[in-house]
Regions:
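Long, low-complexity intrinsically disordered regions
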Residues: 541-557
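Conserved beta-alpha structural segments and adjacent helices that either
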Residues: 1-544
Length: 557
């Protein structure tokens, strides 16, 4: 079925409220285009729930690339629930910004999140705890109040601002680094008058030339340590764990309005009631991957195992050293409750497979242009024929590269292969470009697809999977050589998650021996990784004494 035909039928069918529709044969990477198309027809909020962070990041990139309006992002934490580590401030800041804007935004919206994030309890929608501070050039402001806002809303006072979530005050100058800016911001006051707003270089500390007219400061943390919320926490904590818990480091830190590492694991104690991101949406149509409920089941199993380990840990510790964990059902929706809440909304389930009983989209994945049996053998003639055929059929053809360097390299290769191409940065650029051939852009797309009149080819489609590396991954986090890890160290595999390095071993594969790293996962499952693929691992550092390994084959990671 053509996408437009399906959307018209889906949007007109009022009786499908609280029922599920299925749409199959959806190529990986095309979800953002489909969501944006659906939003044009359905005059309601759309909540898209991704199966994992990897898919979330890819769809987020494509939505930004398409410059879709009224899109909001609610990512999951980059930490395990019971770790004594707080999430990255870029993540918490973006979550709070989304919660603030969802409360006051008008019109239809697209909200992107993940299975784990959508099941997590957050501050009630009716609360007024989350606020943003708007400052304008020429306005009069109290510097003490600005400092109080920054401290209360999660910014850390430092000598020099270099990282997101930091601020510094020197006389009439306030520097701070909000997550929604690529550079830190400098406020230059003359008395109480805000003279200048500029961004500046975090390394040199030198201001950039361009002035800003105004700036919106959003909180960096989801937990605001003001008097009301601290009192809420103290009351709930005492009620749950008794008077002896007052001696714990967590209780003392919060009582003193000092952020405690991993404080997000007690987030529900700070608020009078709990909500989820679903509650922040206005009677949304929920679009979700068809594996979401299975992922929620696996996630609940993981949480229960982590919680039991924490309880065992607490039983051997003094009151001051106990973790005082909240149970999984205090932090997240259980699998049955999650299913019931989602079922109260009109649903559309996406599947990459063809649905024999449902509706299937008229779309295709791109077949690779490389030879699997010949290293680095690219079939450029086939690539050229595919591009030319689609252009002759009046289809739009684009190539998504993983980096600017890749884009320049591929444009040179195309020139040598007599393949017409042009460069562009975002979708709106296409209106002002003399388009001839294939358009080349930088976009986080691991697989290409053809959807009606649009074809995207990915870098991986040309060079193969082993040569592709997502631009989202910072190479500095990967292990460079075997001397970087020792037996017993915890590692994170880019595909399989948290495991433990056991030792090196030689495996006989097809009559030859290969040196491999033996990695252990939950239930003593083993994964053998060839040493030449060492870059797929990064070292995991945590002060958590009871680390729960990920489960091989689970959808949670």
């Amino acid at each position: 079925m053509m996408l437009d035909d399906f959307i018209k039928e889906f949007s007109k069918d009022k009786e499908k409220k609280k029922k599920v529709s299925d749409l199959g044969n959806i190529p990986h990477g095309s979800e953002a285009l489909i969501i944006s198309k659906i939003s044009e027809y359905i005059k309601k909020d759309i909540l898209f729930i991704c199966e994992n962070k990897k898919k979330y990041n890819q769809i987020k990139d494509v939505l930004n690339f398409l410059e879709i309006k009224n899109v909001y992002f609610f990512p999951e934490y980059d930490t395990n629930t019971y770790d004594r580590i707080s999430p990255n401030k870029n993540i918490t800041s973006e979550r709070v910004k989304t919660l603030i804007e969802l409360k006051f935004s008008k019109g239809n919206k697209i909200i992107l999140t993940t299975a784990k994030a959508s099941s997590q309890f957050i501050a009630e929608k009716q609360s007024s705890y989350y606020k943003n501070l708007n400052l304008e050039t020429g306005g009069e402001y109290d510097l003490v109040e600005i400092k109080s806002f920054l401290v209360e809303h999660g910014y850390t006072n430092t000598s020099y601002v270099r990282e997101v979530g930091e601020f510094a005050i020197r006389g009439g100058i306030i520097d701070f680094y909000p997550f929604n800016y690529s550079s830190p911001v400098r406020l230059d006051f003359f008395g109480n008058k805000l003279d200048l707003i500029k961004t500046f270089d975090a390394n040199t500390q030198l201001s950039h030339d361009q002035n800003l007219d105004d700036i919106n400061i959003y909180p960096c943390d989801e937990i605001i340590l003001n008097n009301e919320l601290v009192n809420n926490f103290r009351s709930n904590f005492n009620l749950e764990f008794g008077s002896e818990s007052k001696n714990s480091k967590l209780y003392e830190s919060v009582s003193s309005k000092i952020t405690y590492p991993g404080i997000e694991s007690w987030l529900p104690f700070f608020y009078n009631s709990k909500s989820t991101i679903i509650d922040y949406c206005n009677d949304p149509v929920i679009i979700l991957d068809n594996s979401i409920f299975e992922i929620i089941n696996d996630f609940e199993e993981t949480l229960i195992a982590q919680y039991k380990t924490r309880i065992e840990f607490d039983s051997e510790k003094e009151n001051t050293e106990k973790y005082y964990s909240l149970s999984p059902d205090q932090l997240f929706l259980g699998k049955e409750e999650y299913r019931n809440i989602v079922s109260n909304h009109k649903q559309l389930q996406f599947s990459s497979l063809k649905n024999p009983k449902g509706v299937n989209l008229n779309a295709n994945n791109i077949q690779g242009f490389y030879s699997s049996d010949k290293l680095n053998k690219i079939d450029y003639q086939s690539l050229k024929n595919t591009i030319n055929k689609n252009i002759n059929d009046n289809n739009s053809v684009f190539l998504a590269c993983s980096s600017e360097g890749s884009r320049l390299r591929l444009s040179k290769i195309f020139k040598n292969q007599n393949i017409d191409s042009y460069l562009f940065d975002k979708f709106s650029d296409l209106q002002n470009i003399n388009k001839k051939g294939i358009g080349i852009c930088v976009l986080n797309l691991s697989n290409g697809f053809f959807l009606e009149k649009t074809m995207f080819i990915s870098e991986q489609d040309i060079f193969g999977e082993k040569f592709y590396r997502s631009r989202k991954v910072e190479n500095k986090n990967f292990l460079k050589d075997l001397s970087s890890i020792n037996p017993g160290d915890f590692i994170i595999h880019v595909d399989h998650g948290l495991g433990k390095f056991i030792n090196l071993t030689n495996l006989k594969i097809e009559n030859s021996y290969h040196e491999c790293l033996m990695l252990e996962y939950r239930n003593n499952d083993r994964l053998y990784l060839p040493v030449e693929n060492l870059e797929m691992l990064s070292k995991y550092n945590s002060d958590n004494e009871n680390i729960i390994l990920d489960k091989l084959g689970s959808n949670v990671w």
